[in-house]
């Protein structure tokens, strides 16, 4: 038995930790879509579907990104205190509630209002983003930790993150409704929220070598 070949970690993740992998994908899909829509797609959205000039659109996003870099530290500290599950679910609910109001604010093409809208979305995104790395590392045991975290991240980013801008643009072009990116963000958050409600658990505070 001592010479028995170890099972490949990828096979082991799909065999024994499917529920945790699903939870990892759900948490990361909110992050992937939120990150690409809020921090990379919005300058294009603002110049293509509102009357905002490119320089102002980029300025608003730059300000939001700088603020985001500061906000995320506070969200990470809060996550250590209240737990990953609560933070991830709060982010889902916040995106569902705030996405349409924020995109309505973007539609004004007023620089101060656009900055406020982007800051609101950045705070919401930070509630998720500050948790992802820790949540994925904490949910898998040592034997599959790297593989489980990598699979969760890459599946979510390839399927949802990499296509976010394309889907948002396609939905607007198909419907003529400039709020479609908000509806897409809401749908992603709703699906992820349901999955996380039933699959997410808090592992922070448990030594990593004791997670099974």
Label the model's feature ranges.
Residues 93-108:
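C-terminal ends and interior cores of transmembrane alpha-helices
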Residues 168-187:
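A membrane-interface helix-boundary motif in multi-pass transporters
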Residues 81-93:
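Cytoplasmic membrane-interface "Motif A"-like loop-to-helix N-cap segments
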Residues 18-68, 161-165:
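Extracytoplasmic gate region of multi-pass secondary transporters
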Residues 111-127:
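Hydrophobic core of transmembrane alpha-helices in multi-pass small-molecule transporters
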Residues 72-84:
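Helix-to-loop junctions at the C-terminal end of transmembrane segments
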Residues 142-174:
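A late C-terminal transmembrane helix in Major Facilitator Superfamily
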Residues 187-212:
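Multi-pass alpha-helical transporter architecture, strongest
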């Amino acid at each position: 038995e001592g010479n028995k070949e170890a099972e490949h970690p990828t096979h082991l993740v799909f065999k024994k930790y499917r529920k945790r992998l699903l939870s990892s994908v759900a948490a990361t899909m909110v992050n992937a879509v939120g990150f690409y829509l809020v921090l990379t797609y919005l300058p294009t959205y603002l110049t293509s579907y509102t009357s905002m000039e490119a320089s102002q659109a980029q300025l608003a996003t730059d300000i939001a990104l700088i603020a985001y870099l500061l906000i995320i530290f506070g969200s990470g500290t809060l996550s250590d205190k209240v737990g990953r599950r609560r933070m991830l679910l709060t982010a889902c609910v916040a995106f569902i509630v705030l996405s349409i109001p924020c995109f309505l604010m973007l539609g004004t093409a007023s620089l101060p209002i656009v900055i406020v809208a982007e800051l609101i979305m950045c705070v919401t995104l930070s509630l998720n983003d500050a948790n992802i790395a820790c949540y994925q590392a904490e949910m898998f045991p040592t034997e599959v930790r790297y593989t489980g975290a990598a699979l969760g991240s890459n599946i979510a980013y390839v399927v949802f993150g990499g296509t976010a801008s394309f889907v948002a643009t396609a939905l607007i072009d198909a419907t003529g409704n400039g709020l479609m990116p908000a509806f897409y963000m809401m749908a992603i958050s709703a699906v992820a929220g349901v999955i996380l409600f039933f699959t997410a658990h808090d592992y922070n505070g448990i030594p990593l070598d004791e997670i099974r």
